[in-house]
């Protein structure tokens, strides 16, 4: 009788201890999976929107410089971000959403194309 009670208690102890170790391993795996997903998201963003370093035409302004029109800024999608003022600064519209960033980049590129036509005069 004593032996069966000891076997029962030992079996119960093993049954309780085993899942807790599995939970710790699962938590560690989930943490690694989250880190991996963050790294993959960053890589997707970097591939989808590469930062192209090119020299600018003399007279074009770098990112952060003051401007009045889009055609003054260096970069395909660089725009003159004005807000409520007449003068602004050269920069890029940004959003944390990859799809939204692609849409903004495309819209700014098209807008800069038209802006270049009107600024040429």
Curated annotation (Swiss-Prot):
Localization per record: Secreted
Signal peptide (from-to): 1-17
Record carries keyword Lipid metabolism: no
GO function terms (MF aspect): ion channel regulator activity; toxin activity
Alphabetical keyword list: Disulfide bond, Ion channel impairing toxin, Knottin, Secreted, Signal, Toxin
Homology family: Belongs to the neurotoxin 03 (Tx2) family. 03 subfamily.
Domain topic, free-text comment: The presence of a 'disulfide through disulfide knot' structurally defines this protein as a knottin.
Protein name per its UniProtKB record: U15-barytoxin-Tl1a
Organism: Trittame loki
